[in-house]
Amino acid sequence: MTQTFIPGKDAALEDSIARFQQKLLDLGFDIEEASWLNPVPHVWSVHIRDKACALCFTNGKGATKKAALASALGEYFERLSTNYFFADFWLGDTIANGPFVHYPNEKWFPLTEDDEVPEGLLDARLRAFYDPDDQLTAGMLVDLQSGNDERGVCGLPFTRQSDGETVYIPMNIVGNLYVSNGMSAGNTPNEARVQGLSEVFERHIKNRIIAESISLPEIPAEVMARYPGVVESIAKLEAEGFPIFAYDGSLGGKYPVICVVLFNPANGTCFASFGAHPDFGVALERTVTELLQGRSLKDLDVFTPPTFDDEEVAEHANLETHFIDSSGLISWDMFKQDADYPFVDWSFSGTTEEEFATLMAIFKAEDKEVYIADYEHLGVYACRIIVPGMSDIYPAEDLWLANNSMGAHLRDTILSLPGSEWEKEDYLALIEQMDDEGLDDFTRVRELLGLATGKDNGWYTLRIGELKAMLALAGGDLEQALIWTEWTMEFNASIFSPERANYYRCLQTLLLLSQEEDRQPLQYLNAFLRMYGTDAVEAASAALSGEASFYGLQAVDSDLQAFPAHQSLLKAYEKLQRAKAAFWAK
């Protein structure tokens, strides 16, 4: 078998692919290559997923088909090892009360009456960073996955790189502020760590360049000529009508970052891709492959025009959009003729061990502490790297303003609504409670509660505003029900099934009629039946009477048996739990 070695990797691509695929089979995961893209020469991307659980998927990119597949499989192990596939979901009562929720080496810190953040969690530096004004409480730090107040706060062990000490960081903080940033898997610990640290630089410097509207120096043609594959990819994009700028994003040779920008003159928009690696050529190639990961040439019309409004560009919401799908705003200043920094033909490359030391030295020079959690329980090395003040995707204030576990205390109540027989005032009191707690009307209930509902039921599209319409109906407040029904039709109509949209049109009509005291409802019944159909008229009438107000929502038990999608997710998690238990028992 031929062996292909590429810079930055400590094993041949063929060996990595064979090893990763075999390990996945051994763990019980049946992975399929769902789609491939090769829009220009030397740019490949692939989407792989678990046949039994479509929520477990990754994308890979590379200059060759093999490199893209190895990339996707590596990312799959990264997300399995760090539990990232399950980061947005409640794992149910059984796992929440099992021997361990995340890893056997986790540590639980019980909640106390004063709700102070428990001793033994975080170090002094982290406490000062996450909670400078003493606003954090222990209750805010219960993790979404367990939602188990009785067990307390779950801390995961990280190694502080400056002195090798173990520091316990709440899973809640890891999940809320860092999401997928700084996670990596690889053939060796150094290879994976270099990748994870490079990603931290990439995102941090990208945010700085965008937020500060920095104008970057172009990479000279003679430097680009060292990388003929990249030159050919760019030439093809330009031939298709997309001007390309390749920039040195190192800010004067300090950071191993490259930026490539694509213009789309057909609609006046642009898109900036960033990549980082100690090896200049690897960083450049990554940036170009990232530009087109999961995109064909006809998918390049979804970005935004450049702007002169630098304040809007610097807003945190814009930077979050760039993290999610790179479709945020960019300042025209990035493209100024006179760059803010000179071009540097930088190189931080060496063996992966040397590269790790080089990158760590940059963090040390900036007085940034690095915390690393190592994971080897799946037979492939993976890690999660946290650099407070550099790798955070969301600000620390989100822990009290937008915590992913802020709806956990409502979970049992909301899930029990479809079969409930409460007093009318209790339904209306729940609307008041949601208002008092400041829940956003646009929030999807499944995301608030951490549910994988599948797309075939009303829970999938249910937002807080629509839930308020249902509660108002159940509480007999028809005026409020009409307000929230019309809100629902305005904001959710585009994602409703035809049946659900028709039901809401019918419900709105019946609610409007209920306000007309001098009209006789039966006079209109035949017309309604012909307009909306018997099923919708009966369902809307039952909602109006308070007899069945929760249209399309099935009752759900505490282990979420009602949602096959959630059950497939839990089955995947059980495979991981078995592997963890076996590894830590050694």
How should each PLM-predicted stretch be described?
Residues 1-586:
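Helix-biased "structured C-terminal domain" signature
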